[in-house]
């Protein structure tokens, strides 16, 4: 599947690319990148919408609880169901994901953010037409750039959804180039940090 996604990679560093999708092989690395971007964007005065995933370990459990932190309000929404330590399969709480997605979409429509950051485009968006899909559409309608993670398995669906407005990238350097093209007043450093000029 990664080979299919690699065929979708393209350079994002021009203003016409509204969605920069980071190919996620390792969830923690992508989350860390998004946290750094969000922190630097806020420190430079940019208004943000979207959500970042926070995983909280549970004592005595193999799997953590999953939360989304709304970037506009700071609200923390638990998106995983507690199905017991031995449960297998998806633990995502669809109702909680819908609640988070609606909160994000409202922020996009009412607060005119400068940047939307979403932790991932996954099964809910690709196969079910739900999740944060409407929030992405709202951002595109308002010409607000979107930074999002995507697993190789869902990269073709994201590309089908966003078309030529989407660039799928595999490294942090490409994200920095995209951010530099969208927010020219920023100098994006090699370490993945941003400093306002």
Name what the model sees in each region.
Residues 2-42, 46-48:
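Glycine-rich P-loop/Walker A and Walker A-like loops and their local beta1-loop-alpha1 context
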Residues 17-21, 114-115, 145-147:
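Residue-level preference for the first positions of well-ordered beta-strands
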Residues 31, 35-84:
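N-terminal phosphate/diphosphate-binding loop that engages ATP/GTP or pyrophosphate donors
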Residues 85-116, 125-127, 131-133, 137:
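Phosphate-binding/switch loop-helix module in NTP-utilizing enzymes
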Residues 120:
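Walker B catalytic acidic pair
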Residues 151-166:
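Glycine-rich, charge-decorated loop segments at or immediately adjacent to ligand/cofactor-binding or catalytic sites
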